[in-house]
């Protein structure tokens, strides 16, 4: 699975000056905002432009009514009270038939599950949620004899349906199986999980598509099943659908036949063994384009007929990366075909269903005339990510969700190798620093982080671990591991692992064993210290080559021994170091409590670079004199260090300063050379690193203008060099968008003037905006010169355009307006799926929170509408759980109190338990940070000539 893009590709965002002064009691804040939103809606609703064409209508159909065939029960007399399924009940095959009643927003189905029993029982239980059993289940012995059913009931606490037989069920042996048959029905609307329907426009007509999304625990919403990843089975799937539709599933079509004049039945080939979360089927009226892999496998991309051209790039990148992975893993793709399909409203970024990968449109469809280079890279990365899963995740699946990183960390790591193979000039092997390593090091330096391998025991806990630790930290430690044991032995170890556990389940220890076999190195001993405890170390260098380690935490007052770890927050660190152009690795044993000395041959003032290219998942702190030397070296000739090293210096220094391990004056000195910096990697990290300071001081009327003036000067030379013409290489276009966006953010008049001029020309219809400048022009043009007419025009363009990537940019532009009445109206539009798709609700809230005028409004809107959001998305929705992190920039005691009060009012956090911990910790740290650091930072900026 790939995350939806909750945040823009750039961490920094528009934050102008606040013009409102908060006054009055705290209680009044919520009331005022609530009233302003309501009054604005009632006064302004008539000015919202009508769609240029009738939008797809949201269904008002009700879910199927419970017929009480298997009524609810709180009976806890059996093992079904446990969260995990029992080991003695194991499915081996599903015969699944589903009928999609597209016009009625519902479906019916029948499933027969072949089950092995390793011990006698009278009770069978399996997962179900929301879907209803419509007929008493039927159970047959291996002989075919029917077993009388005493009763069935739903045990909703653990999302089970329990079937109790009237007779003993003996253990099975060999190929003998029990056959459990259940008829069921479900609702096709109401959410973006399970089997659901969404709509789109085609030539002015409303069209429908229905598809599944099952990871991690939503297959049980589509059909009754043993919904755990280690309950692998084969599947024979049939879909009955209106004759004008077609059907897809994991496997190729076996046959298609008319049931009657209106209905067609499509039957698919029996599958290989796979987990329930990978089962997929779709009912559609799309068209496909096709490529063939080098091994002869058909690779198809299904899209709306009028979007066919936008699927070409995805088809091409699929072919190139697919062939690369078949070679790299030395294992042919296991299924006869691989399809991809773009779903018009899709909750996550993409889902790796075996043989039928589903995508959000922004992550699959690319128009070279309308999409930005960043969009192209996003498509390539997500396609590669999902292709990795066809091996890591699908062929070999983690045994339980505590080892989710075996799926997601691996996909996040290998996606960069795959795209690097296909797009060799994109610097993808360095961009992993920007996308994964640096961001997750910030997350993992909080006390509220969690280990890579983490115990999960509820659906909410399972969905919550689909986070940066599983994805990005997983990728980061694999990058370090590959460097330590060498890429060749790492590749061999992956091949051993895939072959040994093909069509089966594995644990983290199994992967370590495979790599040890390939490398003859103590992989488990080293790597368990990185996966079984949270956090990471800072390596402190003294005397140029003596190093010690300790846990790195952003909160300098936190107890580094908490929560308790058997390893005591010490790590076995593969320390790469370079002297005189020679690079070596020394494994720093965690038991060396006094530190170690690197065997370097240093002469004169030679510099020993620890962690070159930030290859290891740790930070490095040098002595003050060494940091001064680095700053001087950057100013005199920054190219003596690689772009990755320059990024690493900056990221480490600002993180160390934030943790009070380094004076901010030293960190800020590293930015003095930036007038000479022309590379993408360092600038991206500078912008991200200083964004924290910018965010903390945006309301400081004395200090913020100093910050603006300084960074305007630092960015201007490269901004002038790049200009406003959309030309150059892929990397140059990414750099230009970042640099000009940062110049606008820092209030550069020339940059804002150019953005406004392009925006105004676009409003007048006299000129189009260059594709790679559109996002920043929509944002800063709207901020700088946007009014109600401009906002309405932008909304009209959002409703007219069919390209999802363009829609996303326009959503950000709408969120950048200064007019709070328009922002209030925008927030209320989130309740209308005819205007804002369900998939985009949390994206828009986040965009509004990046606007200084919308930050508090967005947070208060969430509080006022929490019951509505929970009702619409459920408390276990990971995106609802994470939306509270929009409060991370808050830095006052009042704001902290408001957050604590809100969380106390709604104590059931569901999938948001960990995000709540993280945002509270962050805001507390922000308050302390301001008290400690404002003076030294002010002195540094005030001392500038």
Curated annotation (Swiss-Prot):
The active site is at 386 (proton acceptor). The chain crosses the membrane at residues 19-39. Substrate binds at residues 215, 349-353, 878. Substrate specificity is modulated by calcium which enhances the enzymatic activity for cleavage of acidic residues while reducing its activity with basic residues. Inhibited by aminopeptidase inhibitors amastatin and bestatin. It is a single-pass type II membrane protein. It is found in: Cell membrane. Binds 1 zinc ion per subunit. GO terms for molecular function: aminopeptidase activity; glutamyl aminopeptidase activity; metalloaminopeptidase activity; metallopeptidase activity; peptidase activity; zinc ion binding. Residues 1-18 are cytoplasmic. It comes from the Eukaryota. The record marks 213 as: Binds calcium which modulates its enzyme activity. It catalyses: Release of N-terminal glutamate (and to a lesser extent aspartate) from a peptide. InterPro entries: Aminopeptidase_N-like_N, Aminopeptidase_N-like_N_sf, ERAP1-like_C_dom, M1_APN-typ, Peptidase_M1, Peptidase_M1_aminopeptidases, Peptidase_M1_dom, Peptidase_M4/M1_CTD_sf. The keyword Aminoacyl-tRNA synthetase does not apply. Zn(2+) binds at residues 385, 389, 408. Its cofactor is Zn(2+). Its main location: membrane. The record marks 471 as: Transition state stabilizer. Glycans are attached at residues 116, 189, 316, 546, 601, 637, 669, 754, 792. Gene3D superfamilies: 1.25.50.20, 2.60.40.1910, Neutral Protease Domain 2, tricorn interacting facor f3 domain. Its EC number is 3.4.11.7. Pfam families: ERAP1_C (PF11838), Peptidase_M1 (PF01433), Peptidase_M1_N (PF17900). Early B-lineage cells and certain stromal cell of hemopoietic tissues. Also expressed by capillary endothelial cells, placenta, and epithelial cells of the intestine and proximal renal tubules. Belongs to the peptidase M1 family. Regulates central hypertension through its calcium-modulated preference to cleave N-terminal acidic residues from peptides such as angiotensin II. This is Glutamyl aminopeptidase. The lineage of its organism: Eukaryota, Metazoa, Chordata, Craniata, Vertebrata. The gene is Enpep.
């Amino acid at each position: 699975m790939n995350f939806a893009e909750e945040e823009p590709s750039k961490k920094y965002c528009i934050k102008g000056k606040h013009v409102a002064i908060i006054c009055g009691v705290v209680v009044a804040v919520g009331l005022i905002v609530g009233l302003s939103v309501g009054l604005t809606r009632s006064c302004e609703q008539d000015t919202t432009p009508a769609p240029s064409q009738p939008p797809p209508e949201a269904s008002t159909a009700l879910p199927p009514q419970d017929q009480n065939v298997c009524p609810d029960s709180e009976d806890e007399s059996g093992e079904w009270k446990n969260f995990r399924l029992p080991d003695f009940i194991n499915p081996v095959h599903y015969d699944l038939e589903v009928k999609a009643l597209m016009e009625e927003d519902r479906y019916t189905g029948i499933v027969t599950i072949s089950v092995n029993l390793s011990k006698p029982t009278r009770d069978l239980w399996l997962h179900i949620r929301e879907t209803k059993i419509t007929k008493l289940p039927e159970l047959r012995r291996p002989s075919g004899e029917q077993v009388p059913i005493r009763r069935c009931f739903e045990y909703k606490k653990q999302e089970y349906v329990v079937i109790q037989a009237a007779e003993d069920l003996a253990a099975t042996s060999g190929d003998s199986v029990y056959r459990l048959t259940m008829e069921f029905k479900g609702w096709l609307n109401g959410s973006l999980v399970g089997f659901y329907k969404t709509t789109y426009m085609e030539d002015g007509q409303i069209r429908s598509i229905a598809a599944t999304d099952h990871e991690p625990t939503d297959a049980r919403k589509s059909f009754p099943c043993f919904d755990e990843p280690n309950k692998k089975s084969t599947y024979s799937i049939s879909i009955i659908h209106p004759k004008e539709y077609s059907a897809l599933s994991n496997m190729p079509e076996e046959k298609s036949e008319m049931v009657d004049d209106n209905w067609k039945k499509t039957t698919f080939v029996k599958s290989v063994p796979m987990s329930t979360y990978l089962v997929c089927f779709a009912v559609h009226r799309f068209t496909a384009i096709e490529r063939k892999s080098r091994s002869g496998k058909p690779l198809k991309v299904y899209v709306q007929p009028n979007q066919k051209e936008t699927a070409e790039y995805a088809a091409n990148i699929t072919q190139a990366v697919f062939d690369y992975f078949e070679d790299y893993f030395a294992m042919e793709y296991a299924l006869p075909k691989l399809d991809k399909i773009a779903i018009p409203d899709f909750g996550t970024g993409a889902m790796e269903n075996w043989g039928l990968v589903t995508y959000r449109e922004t992550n699959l469809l690319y128009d070279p005339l309308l999409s930005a280079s960043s969009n192209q890279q996003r498509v390539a990365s997500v396609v590669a990510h999902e292709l990795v899963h066809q091996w890591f995740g699908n062929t070999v699946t983690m045994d339980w969700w505590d080892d989710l990183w075996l799926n997601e960390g691996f996909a996040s790591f290998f996606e960069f190798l795959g795209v690097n193979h296909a797009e060799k000039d994109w610097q993808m092997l360095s961009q992993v620093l920007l996308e994964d390593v640096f961001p997750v090091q910030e997350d993992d330096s909080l006390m509220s982080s969690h280990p890579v391998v983490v115990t999960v025991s509820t659906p909410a806990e399972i969905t919550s671990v689909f986070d940066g630790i599983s994805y990005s930290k997983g990728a980061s430690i694999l990058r370090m591991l590959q460097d330590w044991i060498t890429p060749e032995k790492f590749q061999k170890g992956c091949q051993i692992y895939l072959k040994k556990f093909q069509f089966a389940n594995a644990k983290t220890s199994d992967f370590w064993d495979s790599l040890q076999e390939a490398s003859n190195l103590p992989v488990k001993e080293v790597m368990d210290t990185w996966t079984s405890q949270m956090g990471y170390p800072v390596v402190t260098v003294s005397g140029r080559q003596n190093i010690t380690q300790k846990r790195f935490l952003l909160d300098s007052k936190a107890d580094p021994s908490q929560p308790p770890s058997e390893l005591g927050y010490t790590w076995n660190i593969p320390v790469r170091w370079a002297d005189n152009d020679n690079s070596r690795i020394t494994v720093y044993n965690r038991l060396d409590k006094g530190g170690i000395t690197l065997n370097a041959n240093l002469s004169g003032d030679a510099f020993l670079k620890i962690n070159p290219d930030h290859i290891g998942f740790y930070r490095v702190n040098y002595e003050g004199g060494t940091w001064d030397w680095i700053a001087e070296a950057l100013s005199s000739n920054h190219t003596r260090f690689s772009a990755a090293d320059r990024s690493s210096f900056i990221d480490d220094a600002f993180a160390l300063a934030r943790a009070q391990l380094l004076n901010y004056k030293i960190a800020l000195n590293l930015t003095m050379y930036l007038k000479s910096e022309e590379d993408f990697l360092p600038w991206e990290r500078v912008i991200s690193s200083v964004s924290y300071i910018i965010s903390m001081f945006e309301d400081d009327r004395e200090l913020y203008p100093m910050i603006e003036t300084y960074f305007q000067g630092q960015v201007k030379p490269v901004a002038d060099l790049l200009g406003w013409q959309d030309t150059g290489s892929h990397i140059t276009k990414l750099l230009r968008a970042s640099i000009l966006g940062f110049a606008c953010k820092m209030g550069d008049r020339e940059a804002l003037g150019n953005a406004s001029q392009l925006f105004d020309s676009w409003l007048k219809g006299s000129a189009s905006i260059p594709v790679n400048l559109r996002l920043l022009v929509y944002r800063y043009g709207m901020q700088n010169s946007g009014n109600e007419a401009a906002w309405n025009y932008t909304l009209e363009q959002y409703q007219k355009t069919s390209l999802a990537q363009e829609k996303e940019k326009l959503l950000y532009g709408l969120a950048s307006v200064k007019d709070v009445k328009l922002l209030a109206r925008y927030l209320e539009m989130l309740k209308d799926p005819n205007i804002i798709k369900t998939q985009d609700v949390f994206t828009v809230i986040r965009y509004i929170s990046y606007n200084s005028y919308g930050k508090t409004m967005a947070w208060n809107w969430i509080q006022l509408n929490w019951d509505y959001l929970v009702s619409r998305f459920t408390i276990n929705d990971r995106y609802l759980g994470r939306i509270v992190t929009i409060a991370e920039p808050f830095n006052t005691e009042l704001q902290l109190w408001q957050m604590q009060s809100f969380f106390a009012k709604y104590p059931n956090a569901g999938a948001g338990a960990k995000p709540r911990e993280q945002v509270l910790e962050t805001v507390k740290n922000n308050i302390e940070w301001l008290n400690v650091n404002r003076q030294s930072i002010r002195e540094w900026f005030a001392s500038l000539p």
